[in-house]
From Swiss-Prot:
PANTHER family cross-referenced by the UniProt entry: ATP SYNTHASE SUBUNIT B, CHLOROPLASTIC
Protein name: ATP synthase subunit b, chloroplastic
Recorded name of the encoding gene: atpF
Transmembrane segments: 27-49
The species this protein was found in: Crucihimalaya wallichii
Family: Belongs to the ATPase B chain family.
Cellular component annotations (GO), alphabetically ordered: chloroplast thylakoid membrane; proton-transporting ATP synthase complex
Keywords: ATP synthesis, CF(0), Chloroplast, Hydrogen ion transport, Ion transport, Membrane, Plastid, Thylakoid, Transmembrane, Transmembrane helix, Transport
Entry annotated with the keyword Nucleotidyltransferase: no
Lineage: Eukaryota, Viridiplantae, Streptophyta, Embryophyta, Tracheophyta
Subunit structure: F-type ATPases have 2 components, F(1) - the catalytic core - and F(0) - the membrane proton channel. F(1) has five subunits: alpha(3), beta(3), gamma(1), delta(1), epsilon(1). F(0) has four main subunits: a(1), b(1), b'(1) and c(10-14). The alpha and beta chains form an alternating ring which encloses part of the gamma chain. F(1) is attached to F(0) by a central stalk formed by the gamma and epsilon chains, while a peripheral stalk is formed by the delta, b and b' chains.
Length: 184
């Protein structure tokens, strides 16, 4: 604290006229010494300060330039992504339309296939019915023929006596015998 008070005391005290030198006490220096010190600092510090400011300015400009490049790249990526999105949306629409048309085509194919299958089943059914009708008709004919034959045999048996029956058999045997002689 004593140095600080001493320096204020020295402000009011001027050195004697015969001495020349630098006063290192900043608070006790005169304006000439201060201007010399500031001049030396400005002269030598100007280059260093300019270099520091130029370096800082270059870094700021580089950062701005890099930021602009990154911004441009981001904008380009965004445009590319939007273009890809539009392309994918277009392809999705095409797939959707193609899918709907494919579904309609498959639906028509299924309807046609089902119609053909039903037609074949109808034909099989008709053929089966016709076959069953023919079989039934044949069975009825066979029964009618058997009943007619049994009726004829019954009528013949009731009308013919044993003697008439033997004569008919002999006559038929005779006819077969003459037929055999003619064919030989």
């Amino acid at each position: 604290m004593k140095n600080l008070t001493d320096s204020f005391v020295y402000l009011g005290h001027w050195p004697s006229a015969g001495s020349f030198g630098f006063n290192t006490d900043i608070l006790a220096t005169n304006p000439i010494n201060l201007s010399v010190v500031f001049g030396v600092l400005i002269f030598f510090g100007k280059g260093v300060l300019n270099d520091l400011l130029d370096n800082r300015k270059q870094r700021i400009l580089n950062t701005i330039r890099n930021s602009e490049e990154l911004r441009e790249a981001a904008i380009q990526q965004l445009e590319n992504a939007r273009a890809r999105l539009r392309k994918v949306e277009t392809e999705a629409d095409q797939f959707r339309v193609n899918g709907y048309s494919e579904i309609e085509r498959e639906k028509l194919n299924l309807i046609n296939s089902t119609y053909k299958t039903l037609k074949q089943l109808e034909n099989y059914k008709n053929e089966t019915i016709l076959f069953e009708q023919q079989r039934t008709i044949n069975q009825v004919r066979e029964r009618v023929f058997q009943q007619a034959l049994q009726g004829a045999i019954g009528t013949l048996n009731s009308c013919l006596s044993n003697e008439l029956h033997l004569r008919t058999i002999n006559a038929n045997i005779g006819m077969f015998g003459t037929m055999k002689e003619i064919t030989d």
